[in-house]
Amino acid sequence: MKIGIVGAMAQEVEILKNLMADRTETRVASAVIFEGKINGKDVALLQSGIGKVAAAIGTTALLQLAKPDCVINTGSAGGVAKGLKVGDIVISDETRYHDADVTAFGYEKGQLPANPAAFLSDKKLADLAQEIAEKQGQSVKRGLICSGDSFINSEDKITQIQADFPNVMGVEMEATAIAQVCYAFNVPFVVVRAISDGGDGKASMSFEEFLPLAAKQSSTLVLGMIDRL
């Protein structure tokens, strides 16, 4: 099995990249794909760049060139569900766009034509992620992750997203685009993100301060998954 891993930022993939043996590097547009072995397992690690388009370009290149059997999206997210704190893990059961709106033509909020309203994560991967997170002693929640091309940093924006998606756990900028590409290519995926901020007025300062912690937490979980896949 070859495991595909996607992170948007250098900080989000650095730990995993540095553990990779026999590493090769391929650049496609703004994306970088690192291939090699982590703990003896074949891994293709994508640093996609930030945002939905960058994530889609990179994930398409990853699936076409490296041909992984599954994809794990790692990195950070803003926590909007009650009780989430910095460093906690959110695992996707499903992902949706919070900034897509074709409701004028009868689609659900967040749904794009010719696509489902929600992209469902692979249950086996999500179950494995939850099991390992709990064994590692990490605080974990599982559910809906919403994506959009905005860094959410105000209570008003959170309130608006929660009005459309009451069950949303976390918000970020790539996961649903990654999920859409995996759906199109019929490749199982899961999103595993660590909370870096609360999506509120202090989010930008919190993100800068706690991104290293979030990257460490999510990478630790992904390493545990690699050992079991």
Curated annotation (Swiss-Prot):
Substrate binds at residues 78, 152, 173-174. GO terms for biological process: L-methionine salvage from methylthioadenosine; L-methionine salvage from S-adenosylmethionine; nucleoside catabolic process. This is 5'-methylthioadenosine/S-adenosylhomocysteine nucleosidase. The active site is at 12 (proton acceptor), 197 (proton donor). Pfam families: PNP_UDP_1. It catalyses: S-adenosyl-L-homocysteine + H2O = S-(5-deoxy-D-ribos-5-yl)-L-homocysteine + adenine; S-methyl-5'-thioadenosine + H2O = 5-(methylsulfanyl)-D-ribose + adenine; 5'-deoxyadenosine + H2O = 5-deoxy-D-ribose + adenine. Catalyzes the irreversible cleavage of the glycosidic bond in both 5'-methylthioadenosine (MTA) and S-adenosylhomocysteine (SAH/AdoHcy) to adenine and the corresponding thioribose, 5'-methylthioribose and S-ribosylhomocysteine, respectively. Also cleaves 5'-deoxyadenosine, a toxic by-product of radical S-adenosylmethionine (SAM) enzymes, into 5-deoxyribose and adenine. InterPro entries: MTA_SAH_Nsdase, Nucleoside_phosphorylase_d, Nucleoside_phosphorylase_sf. Signal peptide: none annotated.
